[in-house]
UniProtKB/Swiss-Prot annotation:
Modified residues (Phosphoserine): S44
Record-listed S-nitrosocysteine modification sites: C93
Family under the similarity heading: Belongs to the globin family.
Quaternary assembly: Heterotetramer of two alpha chains and two beta chains.
Tissue spec. comment: Red blood cells.
Record's protein name: Hemoglobin subunit beta
Residues with Phosphothreonine modification: T12
GO molecular function, one term: organic acid binding
CDD domains associated with the record: Hb-beta-like (cd08925)
Keyword Amino-acid biosynthesis found: no
Residues annotated to bind heme b: H63, H92
Alphabetized UniProt keyword annotations: Acetylation, Heme, Iron, Metal-binding, Oxygen transport, Phosphoprotein, S-nitrosylation, Transport
Top-level taxon in the UniProt lineage: Eukaryota
């Protein structure tokens, strides 16, 4: 992902304030609520029968934290996202058979959750930088698909 120095600074500065546990669970939960067909990848997570059940589900929260941990790692390797996410791309493609379009959906949901959490601090410039990053991460995660 090509970011200007200003964009990179905006992304890393805001990310330093992100509560990965909270935002990860909320982002994954919102994905599962807004795009219910994505729930099929999470059969083992138990009750996903309502928005309240999804948002309160400890397995959703735990996996959301894990997802955002990987995203954090990607922020440290913006110049090599494909390499950083190669194993996760392979896993999601070959073993889990996740539609790569879902990575874009999750990225967009993450941007919405960040905007919700940070309000005025999430300026149009910060949003534009994050849109570049989530698009780059989605592209890297889709890289191993054939």
């Amino acid at each position: 992902v090509h970011l200007t120095p200003e964009e990179k600074n905006a992304v890393t500065t805001l990310w330093g304030k992100v509560n990965v546990d909270e935002v990860g669970g909320e982002a994954l939960g919102r994905l599962l609520v807004v795009y219910p067909w994505t729930q099929r990848f999470f059969d083992s997570f138990g009750d996903l029968s309502s928005p309240a059940a999804v948002m309160g589900n400890p397995k959703v929260k735990a996996h959301g934290k894990k997802v955002l941990g990987a995203f954090s790692d990607g922020l440290n390797h913006l110049d090599n996202l494909k390499g950083t996410f190669a194993q996760l791309s392979e896993l999601h493609c070959d073993k889990l058979h996740v539609d790569p379009e879902n990575f874009k959906l999750l990225g967009n949901v993450l941007v919405c959750v960040l905007a919700h959490h940070f309000g005025k601090e999430f300026t149009p410039q910060v949003q534009a930088a994050y849109q570049k990053v989530v698009a780059g991460v989605a592209n890297a995660l889709a890289h191993k698909y054939h």
